[in-house]
Amino acid sequence: SLAGNLEGYVIGLTYKRKQETSMARHRRTHPFRDSRQDIETARDIPDTAQTRAPSYKLAFADEAFMEREELRPVRLQLELLKPQLLMDEYGVESTVVLFGGARIPEPEKKAQAKTPYLAELSRYYDEARRFARMVTERSLAMGGKRDIVVTGGGPGVMEAGNRGAQEAGGISIGLNIVLPHEQAPNAYVTPDLCFNFHYFAIRKMHFLMRANAICVFPGGFGTLDEMFESLTLIQTGRMKPVPFLLFGRAFWERIINWQALADAGTIGPDDLKLITYVETAEEAFEVFCAAEGACGDQTTS
C-alpha cells in the first residue's frame, strides 16, 4: 500500500541518516590521499597509448582484473566485508532468519500455483508475514536493533517475511544471489539493506552470523540446503544453539524421515531435539520469545 511504502521510506531514511553519521565518525584522519581522489584524478589524465593500456588502471578500480580467477580470495573477502560493514553502520545487532520456498504464492494468488499442493502451502505465506510482523513489532519495542528479519530477498515466503516487517514499520534485510532465472528483489526489503551475492557460502554465513532464531518454511532445494547447513553447524558445535522452528510438521515429515536417521544411528537421539515443529505465527512467536527470555520484557536496549 502507499501508506506502507511511505512508512518504509521514512524508516529507511532515518536509518540512512544514522548510517551517514556513522560513516562520518569513521572518516580517515591520516594525511594520505584516499582512493576516491586518485580514481577521480585518473579519469582526467591525457589519452595516450600507455594510459589506455589495461595494465595502467588502478588495480582496485579495474573490473577485468578483479574478475580474474586468481582474485577469488579477494572477492570472497569483499562479499563478507561489504554487508558486514553496512549492517554494522545500520546498527543491526541480531536477526531472525526466515528460510522458505520462492514458489509459494500468497493466498490471494493461489489459483496461479503450479500444483495443487503449492496452492495448499499458500497459507504459509500468511504465517511468515504475520510472524515477521510480530517479531518486528517486538524488535521496535526494544529499540529496533535486535532481531531484524532477514530473508533471501526473493518472492514467496521470502517476500512474506520482508512484507510483514515493513507492515510493522520496521526494517528488514534481503540477501539475494545472482541466478540465471532470478528477478529483482521483492519490493518490501529495506533498500539500504538489500544485498546481492555471487557466492552461496558467504551468503549463508551472513544469514547465520547474527541469527537469534532460524525459521524454516516449506521449500525446495535452496531451503533444504540452508536448513541442513544450519542444523549441521549447530549439531557440530560450530554455532550456538538457537530456536530452530520448522513450520508445517506434515510437510516436513512427508519429505524427511528424521526418526529413521536416529534409528539408523547416523544422528543421535538428542539431535531430534534441535528442531521444534510449529504450525502458526503465534505458536512460533511464543517459542521464540520463551527462548529469548520473556515475551513481556520489551525494555529498550
Predicted features and spans:
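Glycine-rich beta-alpha loop segments
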Residues: T29-P46, Q50-A59, E63-L175
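Short, solvent-exposed amphipathic alpha-helical segments in soluble enzyme
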Residues: Q166-E167, E229-I234, A260-A264, E292-G293
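Short, acidic/small-residue loops that bind anionic groups at enzyme active sites
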Residues: G169-E182, F217, L231-W258, P269-D270
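Solvent-exposed alpha-helices and their adjacent loops that cap or buttress functional pockets
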Residues: D88-G91, A141-G143, Q166, N186-V189, ...
